[in-house]
Amino acid sequence: MLKVLVVEDEEMIRKGIVLAVDWAALDCVVVGEAADGLQALKAVERYDPSLIITDLKMPNMDGIQMMEALRARGSRAYVIILTAYDSFTYARSALRLGAVDFLLKPFHDGELEAAVIKLRRRIEAEGSGTAPALPERKKGDKSKYVLQAMDYIGQHY
């Protein structure tokens, strides 16, 4: 079972994420909520979630800063970004820090459910219930080409 932490500064949206998805049907349980990255770091220590669903733009500590702090602490939690900010800079930063998905608001509960199902399939394929520690990108890593493509698209479109 995946333990989920929902990080969103807008309470109505945060509660909507918690209530809109049939977490039990996805073999998940929401173990905590946080209104910003600082609260999320405390919640990670307390609940040890395996999945963090987070906004990017939040007061005190944004989602990118939170992911950097999680990486520095060796967190093995998967991260799904759920944000209204569709900037390639944000997407690129989130991917570099190990985000497994990037969803845009407004979203439908089906989109979030699909992202969780995709993650569960990835976990099953890896044969583990937690992600490997967020690794540094290695030279020659195929994901660099994805990041380069995103950079190109951001510059030319």
Each model region followed by its residue ranges:
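Two-component/phosphorelay signaling modules centered on CheY-like receiver
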Residues: 11-32, 46
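Non-catalytic signal-transmission and effector/linker regions of two-component phosphorelay proteins
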Residues: 1-3
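CheY-like receiver
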Residues: 23, 41-148
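Conserved acidic carboxylate
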Residues: 8
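Structural signal for short hydrophobic segments within the conserved structured cores
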Residues: 5, 29-32, 101, 152
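Basic, amphipathic alpha-helical hairpins
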Residues: 150-157
